[in-house]
Amino acid sequence: VGDYLDIASWDSYPLGFLEDRVVASDEFKQAFARQGDPDFQAFHHDLYRTVGKGRWWVMEQQPGPVNWAPYNPSPLPGMIRLWSWEAFAHGAEAVCYFRWRQAPFAQEQMHAGLLRPDSADAPALAEAKEVAREIADAHSVEECLSEVALLFDYKSDWMWRILPQGRGLEYFNLIYDNYRALRGLGLSVDILSTEDDFSKHKLVVAPGLLYMSDDLKERLSKRDGPTVVGPRSGSSTENFGINRPLGPNLPNINVTTTRVETLRPDMPILLEGGGCVKGWSEALETSDTPFRIMANGDLAAVSTGNITYLGGWFDNEALTRAFNEICLTAEIKVIEMPEGLRRRATSKEMFWFNY
């Protein structure tokens, strides 16, 4: 769809989305109940920046309690300002608040606005005014090439939905886990399609790409920088059959997935050195260098040259360790961020957001 759009937009409801669609523990949701997930908004900003070919808006920004989530708390003071500036730091042309005035009737009468139902100022209005004043005095935010390209493929999303092979194994969650780990290392991320040019990015991450065209494989193999390919990649034909030869079938790395199993949430497979494989695990055959070994001795990931293949759905600890090691080897600067702190690089400034 994005090929035919002049501009893209999305609706940003950090507190509502934390409650009804972010996959996280109750402890995490309690800790960020009044702030939102520190990565969820940024992920969608980065995604729709690419869908809109650089031009995108926040069409609806949450200004207070909503009416549709399981629980609808008020944001902490300052969060409307933070969410607004975070959107601009990721390239938004506009942030529109939903809504102007809280309706005193009908099914959305409990949904907050910039004004109360009696037309008096609601708390969010002062923060929106503050952002407007700051924008007037600020430099224009000019985007720059991020260190990392994260490849996102809607066809793969459809394939995962048709054959997830296990409850809760969704392509979006796999992509998001990788994005969260990268951001936790202080990295800025461009979310690109498999057809976009990623040749100038320092690191390319490509998890869960069931179908990989010959052109994509060739472009990945010719990169000078590191490439991390994730589980299930290259396992399917374009028409959604099992690939022969078996996946991932990548140039420059000798690894074959011979069997796949999916795991209950309460039976993760521990990795040597920390972290685990959860949900999706592959049996790998290779003559190349092991990159990660499971605690039971089985192979979990393989690396040779600039290409690393992860043969399982790594948890956050395992992904963070892997990306940290790969970045240090490639001399890509990382900063392990404290919980809730994130940053975004632009051409002139580094933005820091404290959730």
Map each language-model feature to its residues:
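Short, flexible loop segments at the rims of nucleotide/cofactor-binding pockets, characterized by
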Residues: 33-37, 72-73, 181-187, 205-210, ...
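Hydrophobic targeting/anchoring helices
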Residues: 1-172, 176, 239, 255-273, ...
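A conserved amphipathic helix/loop scaffold
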Residues: 76, 207-355
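Hydrophobic anchor at the start of a short beta-strand
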Residues: 56, 95, 189, 227, ...
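Alpha-helical scaffold elements within enzyme catalytic domains, especially in hydrolases
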Residues: 47, 86, 181, 219-222, ...
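Hydrophobic, well-ordered secondary-structure elements that form the walls
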Residues: 87, 148, 189, 204, ...
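A short, well-structured beta->alpha microelement
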Residues: 178-199
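Structural motif
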Residues: 7, 202-203, 226
